Amino acid sequence: MEIKYLLTVFLVLLIVSDHCQAFLSSLIPSAISGLISAFKGRRKRDLNGQIDHFKNFRKRDAELEELLSKLPIY
């Protein structure tokens, strides 16, 4: 009876440790590459692109509001 519980606990610990190892092995390299690219300045924000995106969003929102106002209310 005790061997069943020991085996179950062992398998659960094995699965949990495998998931933690996989998580950490993917997290650490991505964090290091993010820090390196931040120090090198590769991730500069393009404000003009963000402004254009916001203008397009506002324009589409206004067009949608206009379209919905023309639809009959049921």
From Swiss-Prot:
GO terms for cellular component: extracellular region; membrane; other organism cell membrane. Residues 1-22 form the signal peptide. Residues 46-74 form a propeptide. It is found in: Secreted; Target cell membrane. The modification Lysine amide is found at K40. One of its GO terms (biological process) is defense response to bacterium. Keywords: Amidation, Antibiotic, Antimicrobial, Cleavage on pair of basic residues, Membrane, Secreted, Signal, Target cell membrane, Target membrane, Transmembrane. Belongs to the non-disulfide-bridged peptide (NDBP) superfamily. Short antimicrobial peptide (group 4) family. Antibacterial peptide. This peptide gene is up-regulated at the transcriptional level after the venom gland is challenged by Gram-positive bacteria. This is Peptide BmKb2. It comes from Olivierus martensii. The lineage of its organism: Eukaryota, Metazoa, Ecdysozoa, Arthropoda, Chelicerata.
